[in-house]
């Protein structure tokens, strides 16, 4: 069942009544406007007379009287004493020390109170506590608990009094503890003990004990009494509306608790003072005994549905009967099926009570009205407005609508229910006559499409046909749709819904298979591209799968033809995407990546734009050399060629083509490219490029430094020859830590095996999954021999031995510094051998080695070599001016790191000299003599190198000398190149971009002299190896710039054409389209005269460019002028009311006409003298045809305009004949400026007529303070 609550208009009427005074005021104002204007005195009443002012001044200006209550201070101070014998901390020599000070500080921080302590002569402690009352009380309690010795006592009080000591939520107990500064412990309710324990100071215990006993004594005076009274007599004791029991409670001061009717208990509880309680009990017993004797009962049957009317709201009807007749009415509980009502009272009053019970029972009636459930909401009306009319007239009638049932239930006073029933029946009859409903079956899968986005479709149908359409929710899976409303509207809505459903049934759904990687591209950023497709095919619904589903099915749904068109369009789009997703990888040496990128990405950006490809370079910190190019195949190939050409130009890169049969390519590449990768690594990292599989090409391209390319070519041809004759492969396994040892230093060991057996041995690359696998390839006998040798080596490595060697302790540090870097390198190189040096602090020289026998022997040999190097180590000084140090180091010290690796030496640069200028101060004297250092300085040769220039090299003598030569070779050299001064600024480039590019490309520093010097030389500083390349590059740039200068001179040829200014807009074209095409086609610049410049001839058009191109552009312009001169212009009178329709939305219609007839049509601007004059320009025959066409359109559109205007006459509201009179403004009568009286104007100098404000007056002696 569902009830409909209806808002009545009573409360609204009350609220609205507040508006009435405003309406009255408005009416008054309006009447005043119509009557005479007010007088000046009425509008501006005069100020009060002087006497009135003086009168008020007579009173005391607010004295502070005794009526004012003193404001209670928010901060209080309390002082209390702790005797010596009760102090916790007595053995303190000085106040403020030890535990006592800490405790005081803690209490102040926790409570916010301020504490001051002092010692009396008798060594007692005085404590002054200041702060807010609550904080002081808490601080006092803490001080007593922590600074004063604690005693305890027990107080026995009756168990039933304990709850009064605790109080509500324990508040009473907390207050008591704060007030007495004690801790009071009360036994738990389940503990039979009645002892209350108090802990604190003696004084506090006494106070707390007294308070507890006082509470108990108070409770001793009170008593509790329970009186058994039959439940039937409770109403007589309580009295009507509980008045009788209330009077007894008030008179005796006793609390009387009568159980409510719903609780099946008979005892009445009395609480209060013993004497008064006894009086109350006696009075109630008397009432009970009296009623028991005098009363009798009768039982009557009343329908269960009428019981609630007998009870009344909140039991008021029962109380009313009891008050009038003195009879109690007992109603059976609502969950009981009994209909018997018992009346209890004096016999003579039972008849009257019975009459009233039947009157109450029959005063209300329940009725029902038959109404189809679909009409219920129409009966209720929008926001309950229809029902509100009924309930407003009969507020006591309750109307209830039951969902799913064809009836309305009315409940209330009989007369009101009858009236309401008639009204509702009338409404139902009216609705049935003028409304209809229909139910249609449409497959539920189409329901959401019928509803439309955000309910657009269904809302349109509802509004258009004034019907209600009820579509079941998706969860019901029901096909039934119900339409309710006007019969005609219902039929029309039904027809449209069925048509929509039919159309959906005839729709075609097609699944397109599109790779998921293209979905995001088709959708576009923020859905831009898919929006364009949907705009192109608005009737087709395109659904992409959820990215998480990893599905490739894109669903299209809509009319068959549109779906087919959309399918073709999307397939073409996907084909373009596939074509544009062709990808090739180009291996480029890592050091040339920055040159391919160019300064600020200029080179790579240019290649991308010109080839229309996507180019991805590996990250700077990545070891990959591969550049990936994505786009159309032809474009990718072009981009690859350009990138390779850059690499070829930058370095001594050779490129060789080798012909190897295509059938051998896969076997040469090997599993996951392992074989070909091993050849590339062995030959200095050359790049070997095989043709695309299936192309049929035999050409293999090898690219890299010349010597490495030749080596790789020989190996590749040898391997191909082997593959052609016979190929045999064997896999063996070895622990990855053995691989470096098997390969040997610089690949020496493995090369020895290869040379002796002729087999090819391939070790796994770092990215391979199987790191244990070693592959041997070659002829069978060679492979078997190599396998035997390698397995013998691996077997030896598996035999772990432990050996030791003696190493001088002074060399130990070299091996263990930098977290054992040297030891780690030895372990990696020699099969994971473990080398253990003795702990620091011990004088042992024994070093233990553990691992494979061969690895241990090789590691011992290597350690011995290192020791020999350390013992043979020398230090060499290399003098290089400090200003070159940064250049010698290279970016991030890369050049120095390379030298230290190549020559196995250590290089130390000096600290930077902070004050390079030598001091000229006199030398310091000590004890009358010059300092020794000063004398040495004097003896130093002034030509010797400075300390800050000396670089120290440590290592073997021959290696140090080689490293010194390498360092000196890194010192930059400067050369000068002749460059004409006028080209300097072009070499520098915009914001220095040109010169920076050259410096980065050639790794040199280029210095261009200041412009004021007008020098013709440019200085280049850098390594000798780079200077020649840099000089050649600079001279090439000079040649380019000189060629550009010559080209600029040729391009600056100017030609003028004389053209009538009226033709200029046509030559320019819409948005400059025509002139832009001429400019691009002939590669010229065309300048039109400035309209605002009066000195410039307006018929001259200037063309700038190559002489040949300017002449061609001139001919193109003159050709357009020739065509324009043949054109004619005609004015046509065209009714201005149809102009907008001929022009169309955003000018679409007029553009279509102009394109169709090849004419120009100009409409008059707003405010033109003749708004109907339209100008048509073009070739004579085209103009005539265009005029005929627009005149036909005018005739057609005018008929619509006339009909529309005739209709508007009836739609307009009646015009007011009389216009409003102009507003008078604010008018007053008898104003001073309009007065004709002979009254004189006030004398401005008179202090009486114009008194002075702000003058001081002698103050009157009054009690101080404001008036209350």
Swiss-Prot record:
Signal sequence interval, chain numbering: none
One biological process term from GO is: cholesterol metabolic process
Q: What are the Basic and acidic residues biased-composition ranges?
A: 932-946
PTM Phosphoserine: at which residues?
11, 31, 35, 317, 645, 1247
Q: Which PROSITE patterns match?
A: KH_TYPE_1
Q: Which residues carry this modification: N6-acetyllysine?
A: 991
List every position bearing Phosphotyrosine.
437
Alphabetically ordered keywords of this record: Acetylation, Cholesterol metabolism, Cytoplasm, HDL, Lipid metabolism, Lipid transport, Nucleus, Phosphoprotein, Repeat, RNA-binding, Steroid metabolism, Sterol metabolism, Transport
| Residues modified to N-acetylserine | 2
Please name the GO terms that the record assigns under molecular function: mRNA binding
Q: Where in the cell is it found?
A: Cytoplasm; Nucleus
Q: Which residues form the KH domain?
A: 150-212, 222-284, 295-357, 364-424, 435-497, 507-570, 581-643, 653-716, 727-790, 800-863, 873-967, 972-1034, 1052-1117, 1127-1190
Where are the residues of the annotated region Disordered? 910-946, 1214-1268
Keyword Kinase included in the entry's annotation: no
Which residues get modified to Phosphothreonine? 8, 295-296
Which Pfam families is this protein grouped with?
Answer: KH_1, KH_Vigilin
The question of whether Phosphoprotein is a record keyword is answered with yes
InterPro entries from the entry?
A: KH_dom, KH_dom_type_1, KH_dom_type_1_sf
Q: Which GO terms describe its cellular component?
A: cytoplasm; high-density lipoprotein particle; nucleus
SMART domains xref list: KH (SM00322)
Residue ranges annotated as compositionally biased, kind Polar residues, are 1233-1249
Q: What does this protein do?
A: Appears to play a role in cell sterol metabolism. It may function to protect cells from over-accumulation of cholesterol.
Q: What is this protein's name?
A: Vigilin
């Amino acid at each position: 069942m569902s009830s409909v609550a209806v808002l009545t208009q009573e409360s609204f009427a009350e609220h609205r009544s507040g508006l009435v005074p405003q309406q009255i005021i408005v009416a008054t104002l309006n009447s005043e406007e119509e009557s005479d204007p007010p007088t000046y005195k009425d509008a501006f009443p005069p100020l009060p007379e002087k006497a009135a002012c003086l009168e008020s001044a007579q009173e005391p200006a607010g004295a502070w009287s005794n009526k004012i209550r003193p404001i209670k201070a928010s901060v209080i101070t309390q002082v209390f004493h702790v005797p010596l014998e009760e102090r916790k901390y007595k053995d303190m020599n000085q106040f403020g020390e030890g535990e006592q000070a800490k405790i005081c500080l803690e209490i102040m921080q926790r409570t916010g109170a301020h504490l001051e302590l002092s010692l009396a002569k008798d060594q007692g402690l005085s404590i002054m506590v200041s702060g807010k009352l609550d904080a002081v009380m808490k601080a006092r309690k803490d001080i007593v608990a922590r600074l004063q010795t604690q005693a305890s006592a027990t107080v026995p009080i009756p168990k039933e009094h304990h709850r009064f000591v605790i109080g509500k939520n324990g508040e009473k107990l907390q207050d008591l503890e704060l007030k007495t500064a004690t801790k009071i412990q009360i036994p738990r309710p389940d503990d039979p003990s009645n002892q209350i324990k108090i802990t604190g100071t003696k004084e506090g215990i006494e106070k707390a004990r007294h308070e507890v006993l006082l509470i108990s004594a108070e409770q001793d005076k009170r008593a509790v009494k329970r009186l058994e009274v039959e439940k039937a007599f409770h109403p007589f004791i309580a009295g009507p509306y509980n008045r009788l029991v209330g009077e007894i409670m008030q008179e005796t001061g006793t609390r009387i608790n009568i159980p409510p009717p719903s609780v099946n208990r008979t005892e009445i509880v009395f609480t209060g003072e013993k004497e008064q309680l006894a009086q109350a009990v006696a009075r109630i017993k008397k009432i009970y005994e009296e009623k028991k004797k005098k009363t009798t009962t009768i039982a009557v049957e009343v329908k269960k549905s009428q019981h609630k009317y007998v009870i009344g709201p909140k039991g008021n009807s029962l109380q009313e009967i009891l008050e009038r007749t003195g009879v109690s009415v007992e109603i059976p509980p609502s969950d009981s099926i009994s209909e018997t009502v018992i009346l209890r009272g004096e016999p003579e009053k039972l008849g009257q009570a019975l009459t009233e019970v039947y009157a109450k029972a029959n005063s209300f009636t329940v009725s029902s009205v038959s109404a189809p459930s679909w009409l219920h909401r129409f009966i209720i009306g929008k926001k309950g407005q229809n029902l509100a009319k009924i309930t407003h007239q009969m507020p006591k009638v309750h109307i209830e609508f039951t969902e799913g049932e064809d009836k309305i239930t009315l409940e209330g006073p009989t007369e009101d229910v009858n009236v309401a029933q008639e009204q509702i029946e009338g409404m139902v009859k009216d609705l049935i006559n003028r409304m209809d409903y229909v139910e249609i079956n449409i497959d539920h899968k189409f329901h959401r499409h019928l509803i439309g986005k955000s309910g657009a479709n269904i809302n349109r149908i509802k509004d258009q046909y004034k019907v209600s359409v009820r579509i079941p929710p998706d969860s019901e899976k029901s096909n039934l749709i119900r339409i309710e409303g006007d019969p005609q509207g219902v039929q029309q809505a039904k027809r449209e819904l069925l048509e929509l459903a039919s159309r959906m049934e005839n729709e075609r759904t097609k699944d397109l298979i599109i790779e998921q990687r293209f979905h995001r591209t088709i959708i576009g950023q923020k859905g831009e591209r898919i929006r364009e497709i949907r705009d192109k095919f608005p009737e087709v619904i395109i659904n992409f799968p959820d990215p998480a589903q990893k599905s490739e099915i894109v669903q299209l749904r809509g009319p068959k033809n549109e779906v087919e068109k959309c399918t073709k369009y999307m397939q073409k789009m996907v084909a373009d995407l596939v074509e544009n997703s062709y990808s090739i990888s180009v291996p480029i040496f890592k050091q040339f990546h920055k040159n391919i990128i160019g300064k600020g990405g200029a080179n790579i950006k240019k290649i991308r734009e010109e080839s229309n490809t996507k180019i991805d370079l590996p990250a700077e910190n990545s070891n990959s050399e591969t550049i990936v190019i994505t786009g159309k195949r032809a474009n990718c190939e072009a981009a690859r060629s350009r990138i390779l050409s850059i690499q070829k130009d930058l370095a001594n890169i050779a490129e060789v083509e080798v012909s190897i049969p295509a059938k051998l390519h896969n076997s040469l590449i090997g599993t996951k490219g392992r074989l070909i990768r091993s050849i590339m690594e062995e030959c200095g990292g050359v790049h070997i490029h095989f043709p695309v599989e299936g192309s049929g090409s035999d050409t293999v391209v090898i690219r890299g430094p010349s010597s490495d390319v030749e080596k790789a070519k020989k190996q590749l041809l040898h391997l191909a020859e082997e593959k052609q004759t016979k190929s045999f492969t064997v896999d063996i396994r070895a622990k990855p830590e053995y691989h470096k040892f098997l390969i040997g230093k610089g690949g020496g060991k493995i090369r020895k095996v290869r040379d002796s057996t002729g087999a090819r041995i391939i070790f796994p690359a770092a990215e391979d999954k199987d790191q244990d696998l070693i592959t041997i390839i070659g002829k069978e006998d060679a492979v078997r021999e190599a396998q035997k040798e390698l397995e013998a080596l691996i077997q030896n490595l598996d035999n772990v031995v432990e050996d030791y060697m003696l190493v001088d302790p002074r060399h130990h540090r070299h091996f263990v510094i930098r977290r054992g870097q040297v030891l780690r390198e030895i372990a990696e190189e020699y099969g994971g051998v473990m080398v253990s040096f003795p702990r620091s602090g011990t004088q042992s020289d024994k070093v233990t080695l553990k691992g494979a026998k061969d690895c241990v022997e090789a590691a011992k040999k290597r350690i011995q070599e290192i020791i020999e190097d350390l013992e043979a180590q020398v230090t060499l000084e290399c003098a290089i001016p400090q200003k070159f140090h940064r250049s010698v180091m290279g970016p991030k010290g890369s050049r120095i790191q390379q030298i230290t690796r190549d020559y196995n030496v250590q290089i130390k640069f000096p600290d930077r000299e902070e004050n390079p200028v030598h001091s000229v101060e006199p030398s310091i004297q000590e004890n009358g003599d010059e300092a020794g250092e000063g004398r040495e300085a004097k003896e130093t040769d002034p030509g010797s190198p400075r300390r800050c220039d000396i670089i120290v090299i440590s290592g073997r003598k021959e290696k140090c000398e080689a490293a010194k030569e390498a360092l000196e070779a890194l010192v930059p050299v400067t050369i000068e190149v002749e460059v004409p001064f006028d080209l300097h600024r072009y070499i520098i480039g915009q914001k220095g971009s040109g010169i920076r590019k050259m410096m980065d490309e050639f790794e040199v520093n280029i210095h261009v002299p200041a412009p004021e010097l007008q020098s013709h030389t440019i200085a280049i500083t850098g390594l000798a190896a780079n200077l020649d390349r840099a000089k050649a590059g600079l001279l090439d740039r000079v040649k380019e710039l000189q060629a550009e200068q010559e080209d600029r001179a040729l391009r600056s040829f100017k030609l003028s054409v004389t053209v009538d200014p009226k033709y200029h807009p046509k030559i320019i074209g819409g948005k400059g389209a025509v002139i832009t095409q001429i400019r691009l086609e002939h590669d010229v610049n065309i300048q039109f005269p400035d309209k605002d410049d009066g000195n410039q001839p307006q018929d001259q058009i200037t063309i700038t460019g190559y002489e040949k191109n300017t002449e061609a552009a001139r001919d193109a312009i003159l050709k357009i002028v020739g065509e324009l001169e043949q054109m004619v212009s005609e004015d046509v009178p065209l009714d201005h009311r149809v102009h907008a329709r001929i022009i169309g939305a955003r000018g679409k219609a007029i553009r279509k006409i102009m394109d169709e007839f090849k004419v120009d049509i100009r409409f008059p601007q707003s405010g033109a003298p003749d708004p109907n004059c339209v100008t048509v320009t073009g070739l004579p025959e085209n103009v005539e045809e265009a005029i005929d066409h627009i005149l036909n359109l005018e005739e057609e559109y005018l008929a619509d305009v006339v009909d529309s205007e005739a209709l508007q006459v009836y739609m307009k509201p009646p015009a007011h004949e009389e216009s409003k009179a102009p507003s008078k403004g604010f008018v007053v009568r008898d104003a001073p400026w309009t007065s004709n009286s002979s009254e004189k104007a006030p004398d401005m100098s008179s202090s009486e007529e114009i008194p002075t404000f702000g003058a001081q007056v002698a103050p009157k002696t009054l009690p101080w303070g404001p008036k209350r």
